[in-house]
Every structure is written in structure tokens, then in C-alpha cells.
Amino acid sequence: MRRGVVFMRTFGKSSKLDNVLYDVRGPVVDEAARMEEDGMEILKLNIGNPYPFGFSAPQEVILDMLSNVRTSQGYSDSKGIFSARKAIMQYAQLRGIPGVTINDIYTGNGVSELINLCMQALLDNGDEILIPAPDYPLWTATATLAGGNVVHYICDEQSDWYPDIEDIKSKITPRTKAIVIINPNNPTGAVYPKEILEQIADIAREHELIIFSDEIYDRLVMDGYKHTSIASLAPDVFCVTFSGLSKSHMIAGFRIGWMILSGAKNKAKGYIEGINMLSSMRLCSNVPAQSIVQTALGGYQSVNEYIQPGGRVYEQRDFIYRL
């Protein structure tokens, strides 16, 4: 430092974030906040956050958490408490996902944390991952942050927003490691038929890809459609299936999600070691929220009232469609 001259050190963001975008929160939301300050009325459809819109969790879930708070003050196993993982394992069985043990279940502070964990454990710089377009932005953001190259495949509006199978096939290269599906889809709402899922499973089988299946909306299916978990159709393909309680039980703020490993786990031993390492580094997901999983999955499913004719979600969906 020369006499009379002061050099001030400044800090910028990491270059790792240069190409990372997350529009659920970020510049778009900042601009919406500015517009609100200017007096404009903003309808916020950027995030699935039920509570501010008047949706509440089933009372028994709230009471169950309150009754478990005192015994939930310590860390749990990195994968989660036994009762939560047991309930999730049984849920997987009901969904037809074969060969799942309690050790294949990981709880997380929402599915978002687990998606980020999976991308960090899998991708080396330049590895490719197939992600639907349009997508839920977290998938692209976390894969990019992990050093991966995101390759978007088309979900065609003219074909009920189903994945374009030929487009998927055309975009696979020797560096492709995995394919992501979001089913039911966010943001399109499409529920994929079994035939589409089987074709995606065939592609993953042929090219030895991991399937990541984001199924957080699996219990919000209307009009007689049936949700099928792709892992139930691909017992020989390594699958990671994500779900949680944020949407179905209206408790996004509690931050409780999970992932289920199934299929050809013997082909992913090194990857699973990486998942275990990163899971251990964050110690555990929040224990009070874990304590309600058993009650939430086994008890009264209030979401069913909302998605039947006359229910709020059903009627609002129809109203918006008519507009």
C-alpha cells in the first residue's frame, strides 16, 4: 500500500455460478417485488407454496409434530429416522417399486436438497444430463452448478406435453449419464401414460442411463388419470425417485422430502458412496418434520377432497381452463 492510497478488497460471486439460473426465486421475483412496490397487483404463480393461499395441513399432522418436538432435538441418522424411512419404504411398495429396503431411503430438507445432492455426487465437468423442456428450473440450475452440461429434450404441447421420444434418442451421446423426468410434470401438469414411461425406460436400459424421476405431485392427479412411477416399470434400471409432503400435505415450510433408490443398485455402488458421503456431510434432515412422515402417509389424506369435483383445486383448475 502506497502512502495516501488505500486499496479496498472486494468480493464477487464464484465463477461456478456464472451460468446458473433459478427463476423460481431470483431476478424475476425481484422484478415482481419492485412492481408490487409501485402499486401493481401481482399474482404469484412461480412456486408451489400452498399455505399463503389458504391451504392447511391435516390437523393430525400438526398435532403429531407438536407431540414429537421434545424428542426431536438431536441429530438423526443421516438417511433419516426409522419410522419415516419405514413408512416411505411401504409407500414405495404400494407404488409398485420393487426391491426397496429401508437403506434405500433418504430423507431431505425438501426434495430440492436431495436433487442438488444427487447432481453433485454424479456429475463431472462436461458430463451430460437430459432434462425436459419446459422444466422445473432447479434441475437445470443444480446440474449446471455441479459442472454438468444440460441437454434439454422437448415435451411437445401438440402431444399433450408428453416427452418427444425421438428427440430424446437424438440427443444421447457417450457423455450422457442420466435422464430426468418430472411426472406429474411441473410446469405443464401432464401425467405420463405407461406407454411413454416404458419407452423412456427402454432408452435408459439401452444406453445405461440413470433415471431421476421427480414425482412430488404424484398425489395430485385428477380426472381419473393414474400416476405410474417409472421405477415400477424398470426393475433392472437404476432409478432415483423423489417425492415429499410439501404439496400433498400443504407443508412446504416444514421441508420434508425423500428419495428412493431402486433397480440396478449394483451398477451404482460408487455413486451411492458419493450420495452417502454428501448425505453425511449435512448430518441429517430436520428431525421434527421427519417425525410426521408416518402419520402423513398412513393417515387421512385431506388432499383427496381438494382434487375431486367440488374441491377447491379441481374447481379452480376448471375455472382457469375456461378463461
Residue ranges and their predicted role:
Residues 38, 146, 206-207, 237:
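Helix C-cap/helix->beta junction micro-motif
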Residues 145-151:
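A short helix-loop-beta submotif of the ANL/AMP-binding
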Residues 151, 156-226:
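Active-site phosphate-binding strand-loop segment of PLP-dependent enzymes
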Residues 121-143:
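Conserved PLP-anchoring active-site segment centered on the Schiff-base-forming lysine
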Residues 1-7:
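Short, Lys/Arg-enriched N-terminal segments with co-localized hydrophobic residues
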Residues 99-105, 125-128, 175, 236-239:
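Short acidic capping loops at alpha-helix termini that bridge into adjacent secondary structure
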Residues 232-311, 321:
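Conserved core segment of the aminotransferase class I/II
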Residues 9-13, 18-110, 117, 284, ...:
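N-terminal small-domain helix-loop-helix segment of the aminotransferase-like
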